[in-house]
Amino acid sequence: PAIEALNGGAKDGGFAHNTGEGGISPYHKKHGGDLIWQIGTGYFGCRSESGGFDGALFKENSSSDQVKMIEIKLSQGAKPGHGGILPAAKVTKEISEIRGVPMGRDVNSPPAHTAFSTPIELVNFVKELRDLSGGKPIGFKICIGKKREFLSICKAMVKTGIKPDFIVVDGGEGGTGAAPIEFTNHIGCPGIEALILVQNCLTGFGLRDDIKIIATGKVTAGSAQ
C-alpha cells in the first residue's frame, strides 16, 4: 500500500517517484506515476546470475515509459560505505521475481559497485547507461565523505567530457531502518556543507551549467510564524 500511495501521489501531483534500490515492482507501476529508477550495488532489476550488472536486462527495463530517470546509488547518508544483506528467510517468491534473485539464499548488496571502481570507470558507466536507455537522464547519488574523492570525480568528467545529468547530494542526516546507529548518526558530510562543496566544485570545474543538483537526506520544510 505504501508504494502504491507514493506512486499514485506522484501521478496526481505531477512529480517523480524514486524506486529505491530494491528494483521496480508491480506496485511501482500500478498507478502510472513517473519513476526514477535507482540502481544500487545489488543491481536489482538489471542483475546477472552472478550478481553483477546485466546490460541487456537494464536496456529492457529502462525502456519503460514510466522510467524517466536512472539514478546510480554510490552511497547514502544513512550508512555511507556500508552494504546490506537480505537474509534468505526474507526472500519470498515475490521478492525473488522482482529483484531477480534466487530463493533460499542470502542476497548481498556489497559496499561498492562491481561495474566500476574508479572515477573514470564511473563516468563511463554513466555513458553506458545513457546509451542503453536511449538517452534518458542518468545521474548518481552520493553522500560526501572524503572531499578529494568528489574532486576526483569532477576531474574524470573534465578529462572524458562525460557528465551526469544530475547529482543527488544525500546529507549525513539521512536515515533508514537497516542502518547501524553508528553510521546513521556519526558518518557522512552534513547536507548543507555537502551541497556547498558540490556546488563549488562543479562551478570551479566549469560543469555546473550542465548538471542539476538534487538535495536529499532528512530534508524538511516548515513555515515560521
Residue ranges and their predicted role:
Residues 110-225:
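Glycine-rich phosphate/ribose-binding loops and adjacent secondary-structure elements
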